[in-house]
């Protein structure tokens, strides 16, 4: 099996091979090393991230493991499903609520003044109990409005004498719970079909769930420490045996991983006496150090590890930065060289435990020299970038693209007096993330040539992006930027699918789309019904001039970094769901997808194989490559 995986890794430069590799990663975790001996753990949940950071075909595959704990953190829980209010002449269905009965009685008070007076005078406590509602009504002399379930009303003739009773149709709806509909007209009522939606858009638009980007950039920290975790191979999979820090100590333990981690945490706690936040600086730590430690993280140790953050029970916080994501693809030694420190080699990861034991002294010495070099390079780079990209600070970001683009957006915002906002809560963040589609849309499986947008940067830098807080609207306004919850119906005739959906047998589905994607879908023949939207009244003007100025400034400081960064931005606009400019990424990807579709419109559909927001596969038999394809590059 190892030989099979090694062969797949060496040839993982096309869609088919990568998909085969994914199938194996459902069962195995690949233990690999780069050319500097840096350990890399590749598993089902992180392979896309690894491929976006490096060429996996040149990695050395050391082994496989079944260790199922090596997985990403659980996804954000699904938001509570939502049903909007429906006020029909025959019935009233309140919007999703923990207390739908209270909503119904308040609705009745709009028509019955005596109920309104009692509510104003006495109030009513929240409850989902019909008997408690009826007890309150009786105590206020309003028993004539008592609540009766529809089923009971139909079974018992006695209720029919009391025409003012509040008849409610009760039901239980998955992911929502108990729901009640007030039946206004018994003769015409039939239980309605109600759209159960994944988001409450009006709730998501609340001001307190959005903050201006500039307000999140004014942060300070006291201490920075370079750190590296080293792993050895055992019969039971990889284990951490050494944690090195600079400036600081090196912790080694071959007998107990738990004690190794606890010693490290005790040391961290001791140095945090004068600050509540410190920064740990690693290199490729997201691909090895953090996932490996997460597997062996002790229970009840007073610290929780989540993604790249350690949080103590008393509120102290440790941010673990992966500086590789600020290196623009440089090796560790090249990164250190280009930022002015002496390059030092580091110990190889994933060596045998017996070899690590035998060479502990030299490994510790080598590790400390490497970390000193990393620390000095990071201090130089962070100081330089924080001046050039003020007020952005490196530790506020997870990668250099986010920092660079945020600084550009912030500069344009300051020049125009309009700021970009970001969601401060998981649910609006999830709503924005849901509008992003990075998946390939498969049309057919014919042999094809792959084309990529020549410059993503050129496309996205000349467009407009949302400014200010969003407003809730039932339907978006043409010409304004918005993100809408949509009911999508695919065309009945032969068509190229432009809206991604994972169920080919469904012709109508609900999804989240940007206003840009909605325009593209309608052009492609889709029917779109908007079910609520976040809309922005103002736009940040195009970023092109400010972006070019920023590139020139950084180029004067470090040409290698700038050239590599520019290459990344030209080829990619990889979405980062933890970024404070997630709104920018959302619309940038939509603009790219609209561009790809404009190219597809010029090609006979029979030749289109598959596509994403930045790539297009065209049949090898297609000879008529038109002028519009000049904006694409053949790979």
Swiss-Prot record:
Would the keyword Membrane be found if you checked this record's keyword annotation? yes
**A Pfam family:** Pox_F12L
**What does the record note about the induction of this protein?**
Expressed in the early phase of the viral replicative cycle.
Spell out the subcellular localization from the entry: Virion membrane; Host endosome
- Alphabetically list the UniProt keywords: Early protein, Host endosome, Host-virus interaction, Membrane, Microtubular outwards viral transport, Viral release from host cell, Virion, Virulence
GO biological process, alphabetically ordered: microtubule-dependent intracellular transport of viral material towards cell periphery
Give Gene Ontology CC terms: host cell; host cell endosome; membrane; virion membrane
Q: What is its main location?
A: virion
Assembly and partners are described as:
Interacts with protein OPG164. Interacts with protein OPG064.
Q: What does this protein do?
A: Plays a role in intracellular enveloped virus (IEV) transport to the cell surface through microtubule transport. Together with protein OPG064, forms a complex that interacts with host KLC2 (kinesin light chain isoform 2) to engage the kinesin-1 complex and thereby promote IEV trafficking.
The family classification in the record reads: Belongs to the orthopoxvirus OPG056 family.
Q: What is this protein called?
A: Protein OPG056
